[in-house]
Amino acid sequence: MSQAGNSPLYAAIDLGSNSFHMLVVRHIDGSVQTMAKIKRKVRLAAGLDEHNALSKEAMQRGWDCLSLFAERLQDIPAEHIRIVGTATLRTATNVDLFLQKANQILGHPIEVISGEEEAATIYKGVAHTSGGSGRRLVVDIGGASTELIIGEGFEAKALTSLKMGCVTWLENFFKDRQLSARNFEAAIEGAKQTLLPILEQYKSLGWDVCVGASGTVQALQEIMLAQGMDEVITHAKLKRLQKQAMLADHLEELEIEGLTLERALVFPSGLSILIAIFELLEIDAMTLAGGALREGLAYEMMSELRQDDIRARTIGSIQSRYQLDSQYGQQVANLALKLLQQVGDVMWIPEPQGAMLLETTAKLHEIGLTIDFKKGGEHSAYLMQHLDLPGFTRAQKFLMGEIARRYREGLTSLPEQHALSGNSGKRLLRLLRLAVILSHRRQPSLEPEVTLSAEGDKLTLAIDAQWLENNPLTAAELELEANRQTDIGWPLVIESR
């Protein structure tokens, strides 16, 4: 593997209680690009006996996995590698025996980090990859521990690591593999008892948003999306999934639409812990974080990437990597936001994320032109939906891509999406299309003075008659756009004044 001098590789390895993970990234254009993700289910925690000693079989599973990882580490500088062990290695009484051989296999030292250090690193991973402002509560359910962190920006204000996880809760409460109400109740109550000591501190600190940063939360979101729900996790949805799980008598028979076979074994135990957290901390809603422990380790090695506005960093990186006209992107964004303000801002698009999604789509809508002009919109959609965009959720990427697909020429209705209401998504598209037409000369000083007003879904664009006469191409484009929007039930009137 050759290394370009200006984009060195970094590796972060997490020896977890359920799985071992390896993340390989490179630093490019002010952002982080994922080069490889390798995961092996080792179930280390399941190998602990009653004296907390790791079985030979569990250690061998771990060593076999590390032999695979070692090959990938050969061409990465030692100072760009971090390897950490978490809850099970903190607990194991014979950890030295495991580490001695593990260090030999990898050729690099393994750090067994404390629960508090694990929580702090998880928070860094979330802060560097998840957008949004305000105070956040971060929940990470691992195999043998659960981390809860409250922080703001890059600063953690409360860090806790609790001795409960999806593997240990499986052994403690679902040992008979029965998915009964009794087992679920016991698992939820056990988790609540574990949470009680931190309850007062966390409630007094409070938070604005809650994010989940674990395989359990990722599995839940995949299930919900597969079943046609939106990506926001709520208590009602968790209880609904508990009922679905209880339709199977035994764990081996568990089949839920969207649940992978790999996650099925520890799904009920992880679900029980999350239900307890929602109920005890009275959480309204949770979304999936963009990263956690491994991302935190990687970003710790790249301190120059620290920037408070994650989304701004992402947009800047994409504009640089794809050589977009950032000044024009800003012009379209400014005009689109001005039009949004004229039609009533949150009165017309009530969701707080609406303006941000409009601005981002405007700044990146031409990305597809780097591939081809004729199908530029299609390429824009594909790139925006498939690029790694820290700070944006999967649903947000999907909506922005679908709007960018339709930013010019032929107009079709948006498909079902879960980032905003259907009405708000449609309205963002209408504003972007108008902003693109009105700014096509790519100079802010050449834009016409316009006033956009709304009566429900009917839009009226008032524009100077003399300007229209002097700019016949734009006048024709606006007339055509009025027909296109009106034809699919979105009335648009162009009014000269």
Swiss-Prot record:
Keywords, in A-Z order: Hydrolase
Pathway noted in the entry: Purine metabolism; ppGpp biosynthesis; ppGpp from GTP: step 2/2
Catalytic activity: guanosine 3'-diphosphate 5'-triphosphate + H2O = guanosine 3',5'-bis(diphosphate) + phosphate + H(+)
MF GO annotations: guanosine-5'-triphosphate,3'-diphosphate diphosphatase activity
Any one of the GO BP annotations: guanosine pentaphosphate catabolic process
Top-rank EC class of the record's enzyme: hydrolase
EC numbers on record: 3.6.1.40
Pfam families associated with the record: Ppx-GppA, Ppx-GppA_III
Signal peptide: none
HAMAP family: GppA (MF_01550)
Database matches in PANTHER family: EXOPOLYPHOSPHATASE, RETROGRADE REGULATION PROTEIN 2
Family from the record: Belongs to the GppA/Ppx family. GppA subfamily.
Protein's UniProt name: Guanosine-5'-triphosphate,3'-diphosphate pyrophosphatase
Organism listed in the record: Vibrio vulnificus (strain YJ016)
Lineage, highest ranks first: Bacteria, Pseudomonadati, Pseudomonadota, Gammaproteobacteria, Vibrionales
